Amino acid sequence: MSMPLPMKLRTRLFLSISALITVSLFGLLLGLFSVMQLGRAQEQRMSHHYATIEVSQQLRQLLGDQLVILLRETPDGQALERSQNDFRRVLEQGRANTVDSAEQAALDGVRDAYLQLQAHTPALLEAPMVDNDGFSEAFNGLRLRLQDLQQLALAGISDAETSARHRAYLVAGLLGLVGVAILLIGFVTAHSIARRFGAPIETLARAADRIGEGDFDVTLPMTNVAEVGQLTRRFGLMAEALRQYRKTSVEEVLSGERRLQAVLDSIDDGLVIFDNQGRIEHANPVAIRQLFVSNDPHGKRIDEILSDVDVQEAVEKALLGEVQDEAMPDLVVDVAGESRLLAWSLYPVTHPGGHSVGAVLVVRDVTEQRAFERVRSEFVLRASHELRTPVTGMQMAFSLLRERLDFPAESREADLIQTVDEEMSRLVLLINDLLNFSRYQTGMQKLELASCDLVDLLTQAQQRFIPKGEARRVSLQLELGDELPRLQLDRLQIERVIDNLLENALRHSSEGGQIHLQARRQGDRVLIAVEDNGEGIPFSQQGRIFEPFVQVGRKKGGAGLGLELCKEIIQLHGGRIAVRSQPGQGARFYMLLPV
């Protein structure tokens, strides 16, 4: 048995709507035809009855005229004859035009009564009317006949109105039945369409729910609707493709997750992953050992298992998408009764759409590193103190020796003496830098704070370096914001920071370059920046540039302590210093000082 060809949804809807429209038009035409027929019949009947009333009125008028003629002293026979002829003519016209049998019989009665009246009329021309009783009876009989005719016509009009009203009710009932039929047909059609089209769609929806739950063994409905059938076939193809994809890809995904889990668990740093609600999704063994010890962190918030306020605030900021742009103080934790120092940093994880989806906390045990740095600082301090006295003595002795020696200016000996003097001066500066660095590292350096005018401070710094810039053909521009406040600063130390930044900018600027010395207020802080368009700083070096003994760029100078000293000075003032740079496009060092 062959399955009927599927009919398109558009065709089904067209046929259903066409059937409704056809029934509606049939009912409308039937109503119009009935109303027109009713009106035409009513008009004909009313016109006939009104014509009868008009005939009755004319006959009564003519009868009255004849009576007036007969009542005269000398009746006018000719006038009477004309009136009689008119009476007969009107009567015959009425009889000819009437279609109602009752009215026809009434008109016949009027004719007979008038003939009787005419039989007594000649005698009236010779004797008075009062002496003729037969005429009076005939006249009264005719008058009553005319009254009956008029009453009959009025009754016909009333009957016609009643009949028209009944027929109108009938037409209204028929139209109501047609309307009910249309509603029933529409309801049945809509229900049929909804059942035929809704059932397979509901089945597809249930199948989609099962697929969403991971069950791909679904039964799809068969239908003879072309569009729904096509949708069902494509849905089946999709389900089969998903089944195959799951079969081939789930293991790969799980394998990839296991590999990623192994990588996260094998790195030396502690790693904690937060979801967008601040709850811990994953912590590798190193992080659990360093931070949480005996607590299971999964599903908990950081403030439930770690009391450090800085870490809690940093997690909240990272979940808001804020990037941590400065080093945070080491985290002190107690592990197996031993105090450990952990360096940590937080990184927000954002969706391509821009909203936050979580954060990542990275921790590293720096206990040994900090101990080494402390030993190094102590060694540098002691070595600097031990070296400063003999080196200073050697420099003074060499200066006295140089004054006693007299070599020609162009001689080899003069060049050697000049080289030794420069290197000894450089060595003294290095020892002084080491001493200063050690003082800052050990907290021995104290600030001498005083109210400072930033405009005057930066203007003098510009004036100090303009000659050096002109010698290198580098322009130095000062850009000051409005209403810079006075700050409590150690002016000598801040001048040292600005001079160091300007010196570095000059060293790394090409001929024809530009340096901008800027200052402006930002809320409760003042930003001071030195920006150049020189060679820039490689990305790999930007994170280490403020570490001691680190030098970057092709042009070296000093011992690599300048930026470390700048950082220490700014931190003592309660501020911070940072850098932004694009290799080949220059660098911008900026510091933020509290107001």
Swiss-Prot record:
Stretches assigned to the PAS domain: 258-323
Instruction: Please give an example of a GO cellular component term from this record.
Output: plasma membrane
Q: Which residues carry this modification: Phosphohistidine?
A: H385
Instruction: Kindly report every residue range on the membrane side named Periplasmic.
Output: 34-167
Q: How is the protein altered post-translationally, as described in the entry?
A: Autophosphorylated.
What's in the keyword line of the UniProt record? Alginate biosynthesis, ATP-binding, Cell inner membrane, Cell membrane, Kinase, Membrane, Nucleotide-binding, Phosphoprotein, Sensory transduction, Transferase, Transmembrane, Transmembrane helix
Q: What is its EC number?
A: 2.7.13.3
UniProt key word Transcription regulation: no
- What membrane topology was assigned to this protein in its record? Multi-pass membrane protein
Give an example GO molecular function.
Answer: phosphorelay sensor kinase activity
Question: What is its subcellular localisation?
Answer: Cell inner membrane
Q: What class of enzyme is it?
A: transferase
- Highest taxon of source: Bacteria
According to the entry, every stretch annotated as the PAC domain falls at: 327-369
TM regions (residue ranges): 13-33, 168-188
Query: What SMART domains does its record include?
Result: HAMP, HATPase_c, HisKA, PAS
An annotated GO BP: alginic acid biosynthetic process
**What InterPro entries would the database entry show?**
2C_sensor_his_kinase, HAMP_dom, HATPase_C_sf, His_kinase_dom, HisK_dim/P_dom, HisK_dim/P_sf, KinB_N_sf, KinB_sensor_dom
Q: Mutating N504Q: effect?
A: Loss of autophosphorylation
Enumerate the spans annotated as HAMP domain: 195-247
The segments annotated as topological domain Cytoplasmic are 1-12, 189-595
* Record's catalysed reaction(s): ATP + protein L-histidine = ADP + protein N-phospho-L-histidine
Function per UniProt? Member of the two-component regulatory system AlgB/KinB involved in regulation of alginate biosynthesis genes. KinB functions as a membrane-associated protein kinase that phosphorylates AlgB, probably in response to environmental signals.
Name this protein carries in UniProt: Alginate biosynthesis sensor protein KinB
Species of origin:
Pseudomonas aeruginosa
Gene that this sequence comes from: kinB
